[in-house]
Amino acid sequence: MKKLLLAVAGLAMVAAAPAFADPAQVKFAYPSAPNNALFQGMQGWTDDVNKAAAGAIEVKLFPGGVIADNSNMYDRVTGGVADIGFAVFGPVSSVFPKTNVGTLPFEARNHREDALALWALYEKGIIKDEFTKFHPLAFVVFPGLVIHSKKPIHSLADMKGMKISVEGRVLSQMIPRLGAAPISLQPGELYQSLQRGLVDAVPQGWPSVPTFHLDEVTNFHLEVPLGFNTGYVAINNDSYAKLPPAGKAAIDKFSGKVFVERLIAADDTMQAVGRDATKAMAGQTIAQLDPAEEARWKEAVAPVTEEWVKATPDGAHVLAAFRDEVNAVRAAK
C-alpha cells in the first residue's frame, strides 16, 4: 500500500510540473537566394543568436523573397509580417534622408569605411531620429559601385545618352549629371532589363555580378568611386519589445558594430569572388578612369553632394560628422 501511495504521489508531481515553453519564433526575411557570403553571414548571426538564447527564441531565416523582397521589406517589417528583415535602403531612401550620406560619391574609399562610419552616426544619435518605426540591428554597405555595361566607358562623353539603372535618390540625381538617363530598377530586374535593352548599364558592386548573372549581359566593368548601395537589418519594434529577456540579450549581444563587422567580412569575400571570377572570364574587361578623367567625374557630381546638404535636415552637420568618422576608421586601420 505504501508503495502504491508513493507511486500515485509521484505521478501527481509529474502532472503538476510545468511544461517547458516552446521558443518564441522570430521570422527573419531575406530578399534574395541563399547563395552567397552575405546570406552565410546572416545565417551565422542567426545561429549565434539561437545558441546564446538557449531555447528562449528561435530565429529562422526565410530567403528567396518568401516573406518580402527589397521593394516591400520596409513595410513588411514595420507592419509585423516579418519580425526581422534585411534589404537595401534604395526603395525607401526618402524615409532616411540623413542616412543617405552613406551613398554620396567620392567620400568613403571602401565599404568598410562607409559601413563603420554610418553605424557610428547611428550610435551617436546623429541619424537615430530616422529609425522610429523599426529597430536597426546593423547596416550593410555593399562594395563600391562598378558600372557594368554593354559597351566600354572611358570618359563622360561615353556616358552621354546612355540609359542607366538607379536605386535611391542620390544615384538618381548623380546619373543625369554624368550625361546619362536614370531608369529606376530593383536588383531583381537588372538582368532582363539589360537583356531587353531597357538599360545600357547598371551601377552595382562586384557581388552583384554572380548574384544576378550580370556577366551574361555585360562585358565592360568600370571601377569609379561613385558611392555605395546601403542596406539595413532591422527588427520590428513590437517584436523586439516582446522578446523574452534571454532572447533580447542574445540579439543585443550579436548586433550593432559586431554585426556590421561580420557583414563587412562577408562583403569582402563577395567582392573578391565577383571581381576575380569576372576577371578570369574571356570577353570581360575591367577598367578604371585615368586621374584627370576621374577628376572631371568628381567635379560633375559635386553638386549632388551640395544639393544633398541643402535638402537634408542638418545636412552640413551630418556630412561633417560622417567625414570625421570615415577619417577615424581610416586612421585606426
Model-identified regions with their sequence ranges:
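A solvent-exposed, acidic/Ser-Thr-rich amphipathic alpha-helical stretch
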Residues: 116
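Positively charged n-region of N-terminal signal peptides that target proteins for export
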Residues: 1-4
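N-terminal secretory/targeting leader peptides
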Residues: 10, 21-113, 122-124, 129-333
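N-terminal signal peptide c-region/cleavage motif recognized by signal peptidases
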Residues: 14-18
